[in-house]
Amino acid sequence: LDLFKVAGNQRWAGGGTFDMPIVVMTPNGAGIRGSLYHSHSFESWASRLPGWKIVMPSNALDAYGLMLTAIKDPNPVLVLLPKALLRQKGARLIPGEPADADELSRMI
């Protein structure tokens, strides 16, 4: 818990003079028939963390994009990854890249 308390406040305690680029990714949620101790949801707790950005993707493509964005963010980011999402297959295309091989080769 100290990580969450300290990291969220450090950037603002220093007057924004230094970045705190931390990404914490954790499984979240129920719906996969987990037992009592494996079906916790942290959304309400996480929403009260000062200084943290909280994201939760709804599909595999969103998870990919949110992770890339979280890594580049100078603030601490908590990625709550729904457990049911871990069982989905994502698209084979990378967001922002053309599907046509000829167009991709012209870009390179």
Please provide the spans of the model-predicted regions.
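Conserved thiamine diphosphate
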Residues: 1-108
